[in-house]
Amino acid sequence: MQQLNPSEISELIRARIAGFEGRVETRSQGTIISLSDGILRIHGLEDVMYGEMLELPGGRFGLAMNLEQDNVGAVVLGEFSGLQEGDVVKCTGRVMQVPIGKALLGRVVNALGQPVDGKGAIDAEEFDVLEKIAPGVIDRQSVDEPMQTGIKSIDAMVPIGRGQRELIIGDRQTGKTAVAVDAILNQKGKDVQCIYVAIGQKASTVAGVVRKLEEYGAMEYTTVIAANASESAAMQYLAPYAGCTMGEYFRDRGMNALIVYDDLTKQAWAYRQISLLLRRPPGREAYPGDVFYLHSRLLERAARVNADFVEKFTKGEVKGKTGSLTALPIIETQAGDVSAFVPTNVISITDGQIYLETDLFNAGIRPAINAGLSVSRVGGAAQTKIIKKLGGGIRLDLAQYRELAAFAQFASDLDEITRKQIERGKRVTELLKQDQFSPMSVAEQGAALFAASSGALDDVEVANVRPFEKALLAYLNSNNKELMAGIEEKKDLTDDLKKQLDAAVKQFKSGSTY
């Protein structure tokens, strides 16, 4: 038997010591000293980060939001019953993360990315942080591709481009969600992934939206993030950031995504509630001083990024493709007051707004878009050529018509030009009405706008404008399929297509009843 001498034994011990890996995990921990309204005060967390996830008893988590000299203020994510003073809280060493990837499409999740639709666990590709810095100026590409909503009045008067932030603003019950949902439905077959973030809404309302998305086959390319009215303020505050992170997955990989925040007023309310409970000093309308930053850091992440950014992000896997994340934030006003704190903040952050008016909605003009107050600051460069040619004067016509119509109430005798303008305005107003859940293709919008601009509607009774439009589109789709396909493909009205369309409209008028 071979004997080991003492020097060999000491060498073996040294080698073992050198190869030893310490598995000692040091984590700061503290105790809850007060608990009320979902807000924790924790003593003893020495090295906690701002925004760090905290491990609470019972497998729950909190979020560190106030770092003070002698304690840490944190919000509980989810249910806080069962927690009590003296409970131990541990640091996790990581910030908030949510699952991202294509596995989330077709699912309904909460603000933490956990499924709430009863369809089982989500096999996510990876996780990413909630709070991210928006792409810089050098990484961005100008907005020049259209994001078609399928709504005539929007695509003609306030066009939206891919990578734009277009605010939808109006009082309650003016059709804000309807506009956003129609925009999602219109992305079918256009290779645009959609995210719908419901903040502070009734569970029944969210269920209704999900049902409609499923009914029209839109759920297969859509993720719904629900932070319902019954959930904690912390979840309502975090939901938009979670949705944005999920949308950035597509943007950064050279794909296109559309995100709807419904609505950011409720997020601002939730943040105000959290801030006041954390004893942060209140400012105007009791909002904290950083409520502008709350929305600006969220909406700046919606952008169109250039091919270099995508190539660098994907480490050369995707080349020559730009990515975009288009945002449609919704803001609810009180009695039409767009000069309130949160509405003015979001108007100044976004690239334009679609203003929906209660009076127009009640008058049966739906979508109830106020042409004078609605604007798109960058979408004009992204508008399709045919809509630009045919719909260019519509916004001006409508604004002038509303002005003249108000003036005509007091004047008994009107000159011929004014009377014609009013008559045309009535027909254009009627033409721009559109049923919910019925987005239109570019060719259909082009044909309808062509009928208005060419004077084909001038001899049609105002009450018959919508039946005329419906019958015309049905006629063109069945008898002039090649013409409609040509317009849809070129997105332009060439001289040849214009002649064909003019002839088709005249032929329809000569032989049809509507």
From Swiss-Prot:
Its main location: membrane. Pfam families: ATP-synt_ab, ATP-synt_ab_C, ATP-synt_ab_N. It is found in: Cell inner membrane. It is a peripheral membrane protein. It is an enzyme of class 7 (translocase). It catalyses: ATP + H2O + 4 H(+)(in) = ADP + phosphate + 5 H(+)(out). Its EC number is 7.1.2.2. CDD domains: ATP-synt_F1_alpha_C (cd18113), ATP-synt_F1_alpha_N (cd18116), F1-ATPase_alpha_CD (cd01132). The record marks 374 as: Required for activity. Keywords: ATP synthesis, ATP-binding, Cell inner membrane, Cell membrane, CF(1), Hydrogen ion transport, Ion transport, Membrane, Nucleotide-binding, Translocase, Transport. One of its GO terms (molecular function) is proton-transporting ATP synthase activity, rotational mechanism. The keyword Membrane applies. InterPro entries: ATP_synth_asu-like_sf, ATP_synth_asu_C, ATP_synth_asu_C_sf, ATP_synth_F1_a_nt-bd_dom, ATP_synth_F1_asu, ATPase_a/bsu_AS, ATPase_F1/V1/A1_a/bsu_N, ATPase_F1/V1/A1_a/bsu_N_sf. ATP binds at residues 170-177. Produces ATP from ADP in the presence of a proton gradient across the membrane. The alpha chain is a regulatory subunit. F-type ATPases have 2 components, CF(1) - the catalytic core - and CF(0) - the membrane proton channel. CF(1) has five subunits: alpha(3), beta(3), gamma(1), delta(1), epsilon(1). CF(0) has three main subunits: a(1), b(2) and c(9-12). The alpha and beta chains form an alternating ring which encloses part of the gamma chain. CF(1) is attached to CF(0) by a central stalk formed by the gamma and epsilon chains, while a peripheral stalk is formed by the delta and b chains. This is ATP synthase subunit alpha. The gene is atpA.
